[in-house]
């Protein structure tokens, strides 16, 4: 009985372990595509799938009729077994646009093209604590909670940037196009956006975040923080477009659509979690937010009196889509996950440093806020960058460190979910009602080997009992 048990269980364990390893070693979409094209069966299915996608916009004959639909469905199912299906991209990578083009061609085919879902970017899983260790201008909050500097932290951050060669180089690179006026225009908005993306992609977070998320005690500081991205050029326009129309425009651009999906994924609020973030990771949320800067969906602080942010849009002329529009806009304005992440960076705290419980479990692999997107005609194929068809509150770390160092003080700089009003100020409550949906399946198999070991132990106990 014992040998029979080993005979059946060990091969299964080996299979699961190998699957776990391969799932964690996920290829980027450029490499996965190259790998697929070298394999005849995969290449054939991939080309078929691309024809199916193209057919949605050009009425290609392959997409008409039941036989064609079956062929498209067969190609989809076959590619689910390939590394191309689970490929991801890295923000700022050398071939990012090409990688995202491949990802969305697969994603639109396998999941549909009407909703933003999972992020196309490989998870970074960084921690704010990694940034704090290298930030020279943030006060030692843990040791001197009562004695926070009365100076301008945003000004200090700008000075620190000028002392760093990389930060100074890329900051100057965006200041010039964002402040140089053109004929009949305030600036060259396209060049300004591109330079801003490079700044947040290339400059270490200790400097870029220091300027964008600096903690403030007065209007002079908050206004400097709001002016970080030169909003007169990168953010403001003569008129505010409807937010759903702006989202439609964003969706036709590989970079913008990807950064927006990343923001939905990593800044998803969850009131039951320790941090008010579903992902329980402030650093990933701040990275996703900063990734939107330099796209048509560029967000910024609404005013100098709160942490509320929003893209340059409103919900006028929404008609029957007013509810969807407000839901989209409020995901930015009333996002307690993002607000707590900004607070945490300014305070020098990090929920993941003391997290006493695992993230909230949901019934889906990844829960994101999904918004209806109207189908729009796509630009000409080949155009660059265009898509053709718990237990403790967020302040607990500060409190714990205060007790450890025996320093008295207030933790009023860190607010909980109920402290935020619609304008981001203390004293009112806000709640964001969102819809959820499942994302593409991931390769998370880490619990399976444990289950197999448990089953093996049980079978061994039974076999030993029988032999005795």
From Swiss-Prot:
Tissue: Expressed in the brain, in hippocampal neurons (at protein level). Isoform 1 and isoform 2 are expressed in heart, brain, lung, liver, kidney and testis.
GO MF term (any one): glial cell-derived neurotrophic factor receptor activity
Subunit note: Interacts with GDNF ligand and RET: forms a 2:2:2 ternary complex composed of GDNF ligand, GFRA1 and RET receptor. Interacts with SORL1, either alone or in complex with GDNF. Interaction between SORL1 and GFRA1 leads to GFRA1 internalization, but not degradation.
Covalently lipidated residues, kind GPI-anchor amidated serine: 430
A GO CC term attached to the entry: extrinsic component of membrane
UniProt signal peptide: 1-24
Gene3D superfamilies: GDNF binding domain
Glycosylation sites: 59, 347, 406
Disulfide bonds, paired cysteine numbers: 36-42, 154-214, 161-167, 178-192, 187-233, 216-221, 243-313, 250-256, 267-285, 277-337, 315-325
Gene Ontology BP terms: anatomical structure morphogenesis; cell migration; cell surface receptor protein tyrosine kinase signaling pathway; glial cell-derived neurotrophic factor receptor signaling pathway; kidney development; male gonad development; nervous system development; neuron projection development
Keywords, alphabetical: Cell membrane, Disulfide bond, Endosome, Glycoprotein, Golgi apparatus, GPI-anchor, Lipoprotein, Membrane, Receptor, Repeat, Signal
Function: Coreceptor for GDNF, a neurotrophic factor that enhances survival and morphological differentiation of dopaminergic neurons and increases their high-affinity dopamine uptake. GDNF-binding leads to autophosphorylation and activation of the RET receptor.
Cellular localization per UniProt: Cell membrane; Golgi apparatus, trans-Golgi network; Endosome; Endosome, Multivesicular body
Superkingdom: Eukaryota
Protein name in the entry: GDNF family receptor alpha-1
Gene: Gfra1
Pfam families given in the database record: GDNF
Species per Swiss-Prot/TrEMBL record: Mus musculus (Mouse)
Annotated Sequence repeat ranges: 25-113, 150-238, 239-342
